[in-house]
């Protein structure tokens, strides 16, 4: 009986570790996508000024890695997190296909606000599921972690 309980605890611990790693990857990709949307919907002048900096700081995954992330999300992510992530990518898709249609101030602000809202919901869902808000770090008087 104790052996089975230990196996179950280990399986739960393993699943949590997989999920935490996956969620970090999903959040990184979602934030990178949001940054890219902001770049491609900018005016021609702004894009030209940002091009070099963007090329150095673009953290979007290559296609194969994105596919792996999506497959892992299908297996390990909760329906809520997977749904929010997929919604963010679906909102971004038309912008990626036709960025010129989203370069007016109104269209740009609308799509960036929508995707920022979804990203905020995604981050909140991940924090809830991982219990990140329940974790407290004890700090000493100098602000360093003491344990």
Where are these regions (language model features)?
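Conserved non-transmembrane functional hotspots
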Residues: 2-147
